[in-house]
Structure formats: structure tokens, C-alpha cells
Amino acid sequence: MTESLDVTDWAILAEVQRDGRIPFTELARRVNLSASATKERVRRLEEAGVITGYRAEVNPERTGYPVMAVVRLKYPGPGTRHQPLRRLLEERSEILECLRTTGDDCYVMKVVATSMAHLEEIVDELAEFGSTTTNLVLSRTLPLRGPGGFG
């Protein structure tokens, strides 16, 4: 699908990343198409798996999670023994994102907590799987975006 994305598709992606609740009529106006053509393009992007969903952005601080950290985990187990860790990742909603990576660290996670003690509890749980390195997040310099985002 990527080779078939045209300038209009990229414009649609930029707009829906900026505002996932934008009405088709407004989206159509911004990308210079009719509402029906815009709706068809969005449907095609969804069916192709380019647009995978629409989510609300939740401010962790406003929901009682003022502490954010990046936790890196060196997991010593062989590749097939990662299921116990994956179960913990599913159970702990404070772990917002987890990426399996190359290099010294096997996993990199974005974690939120209600306090430093709460963060310590989460890190201690993760440390049962291997050595961890934790960095506190001071601020978000660049918000999460997709490729070609906000063009």
C-alpha cells in the first residue's frame, strides 16, 4: 500500500492524526475533495491497515500519573521464554508502550506512575526478568506521531 499512497492520502493522514474526530465534510474541504471521495479514501486506508484506529489522547498527569519514565530491560532468557514478561506487560496498565529492540537492551518501555514509590514498585517487578535502567522523563519534546505526520 505504501507505494500507492499519493499526496492526498498523505494529507488525509496528516489531518486525521491532528484530529481523529474531524468530520468528513471538514476533512474533505482541507484536502480539496468531495465528502464522498474523502470517505472512500479513508475507508480504503482503513481496509489496507494504514489507519489502524482512532484513540483519545489522555494526559497522564490529569489522571493521577504525574511520573513518567523510560525503562530499559536486558532480558537474559532465550527468545522463546518471553511469555511471562508479556503477561506482565498486559497486566500492568501503567506500562503504556513496550518496544522489543536490538542492542544491549531487549525491551524499552514507556511507564507512568502515581509516585516515585509506585514507579519503584513497577521497576522492581520488571527487574525480576533482568537488569533494568530507568530514566525519568522531564518533558515531551515531540508528541507521538505517525510517518508523514502533521505535514
Regions found by a protein language model. Name each.
Residues 1-151:
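A compositional/biophysical signature of low hydrophobicity enriched in polar/charged and small residues
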